[in-house]
């Protein structure tokens, strides 16, 4: 993992983070560094987006492969949840990055 020099602003709900740690074992302070992964894969989470709020899924590497759900709010990235990536998500990451080297 490269340096931890984030330029984005991040925010999250502290109670939601506590619930996320209990459920997934990942704190949002760590999860925000997935945005430093220049090879991360991002796409719209259309199943959970609304007309008022678009949600996104990003898959990237911190110390392990993580999946982070977030939205853009008030010029900040608002983290909604974070967990260890599933095998399917890890495959998306590696398949997408194999295109770079092909």
Model-identified regions with their sequence ranges:
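Ribonuclease/tRNase effector modules and their secretory precursors
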Residues: 1-102
């Amino acid at each position: 993992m490269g340096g931890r020099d984030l330029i984005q602003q991040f925010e999250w709900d502290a109670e939601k983070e506590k619930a996320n740690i209990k459920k997934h074992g990942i704190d949002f302070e760590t999860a925000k560094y997935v945005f430093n992964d220049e090879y991360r894969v991002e796409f719209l989470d259309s199943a959970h987006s609304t007309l008022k709020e678009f949600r996104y899924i990003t898959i990237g590497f911190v110390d392990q492969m993580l999946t982070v759900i977030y939205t853009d709010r008030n010029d900040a990235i608002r983290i909604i949840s974070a967990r260890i990536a599933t095998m399917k998500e890890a495959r998306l990451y590696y398949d997408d990055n194999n295109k770079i080297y092909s």
